[in-house]
């Protein structure tokens, strides 16, 4: 069993998202991350869901999703075929002496300090789940994390 990511294209209609989430809930599948937004065709939305299961479970979820009237296409996101990213905002309590180190680490992760006061910094990062988790672990050792807000995974096909 491992983390799996599904990309679902569906009609951008009232209740469509609710039916997809309801299917997961009714079947006892956990949603670890979900993002939803219209595509370039505003009548179609893309849902990206991260869940946990083996290949057989994911195939079953896909078959059940295809039965929903609004669902147009379901694709499992494979690592080698897609770019995957997530956005994170993190608020930390740091001293003046820690600020320079926070700035250097944030730059190394290609992040931005979007707000800073004498003892609070808010940082924006984008990257893979692993990349963001690594940044969090480094900040836990260096500062006091006040709050974290993560967007959930988004993806796009490489070719």
Swiss-Prot record:
Q: Name one GO biological process term.
A: isoleucine biosynthetic process
Describe the subunit structure: Dimer of large and small chains.
The answer, when asked if Glycoprotein is one of the entry's keywords, is no
Catalytic function, reaction form: 2 pyruvate + H(+) = (2S)-2-acetolactate + CO2
The protein, known as: Acetolactate synthase small subunit
Q: Which gene encodes it?
A: ilvH
**Record-annotated membrane-spanning stretches:** none
Q: What's an example of a GO molecular-function annotation for this chain?
A: acetolactate synthase activity
Kindly give the PANTHER family that the UniProt entry links to this protein.
Answer: ACETOLACTATE SYNTHASE SMALL SUBUNIT, ACETOLACTATE SYNTHASE SMALL SUBUNIT 1, CHLOROPLASTIC
Q: Which UniProt keywords are listed?
A: Amino-acid biosynthesis, Branched-chain amino acid biosynthesis, Transferase
Domain (ACT) spans 5-79
Which pathway is this protein engaged in?
A: Amino-acid biosynthesis; L-isoleucine biosynthesis; L-isoleucine from 2-oxobutanoate: step 1/4; Amino-acid biosynthesis; L-valine biosynthesis; L-valine from pyruvate: step 1/4
Q: Under which EC number(s) is this enzyme classified?
A: 2.2.1.6
| Keyword Amino-acid biosynthesis set for record | yes
Q: Give any Gene Ontology cellular component.
A: cytosol
**Top-level lineage group:** Bacteria
Protein species of origin? Buchnera aphidicola subsp. Baizongia pistaciae (strain Bp)
A Pfam family assignment: ALS_ss_C
Q: What family name appears in the similarity comment?
A: Belongs to the acetolactate synthase small subunit family.
């Amino acid at each position: 069993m491992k983390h799996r990511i599904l990309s679902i294209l569906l009609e951008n209609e009232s209740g469509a998202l609710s039916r997809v989430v309801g299917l997961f809930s009714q079947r006892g599948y956990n949603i670890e991350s979900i993002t939803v937004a219209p595509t370039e065709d505003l009548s179609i939305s893309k849902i990206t869901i991260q869940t946990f299961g083996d290949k057989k479970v994911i195939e079953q979820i896909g078959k059940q999703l295809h039965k929903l009237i609004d669902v147009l296409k379901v694709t499992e996101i494979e690592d080698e075929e897609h770019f995957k990213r997530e956005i994170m905002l993190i608020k930390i309590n740091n001293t003046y002496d820690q600020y320079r180190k926070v700035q250097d680490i944030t730059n190394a992760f290609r992040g931005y300090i979007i707000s800073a006061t004498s003892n609070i910094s808010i940082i924006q990062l984008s990257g893979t789940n692993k990349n963001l988790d690594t940044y969090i672990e480094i900040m836990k050792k260096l500062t006091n994390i006040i709050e974290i807000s993560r967007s959930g995974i988004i993806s796009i096909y490489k070719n």
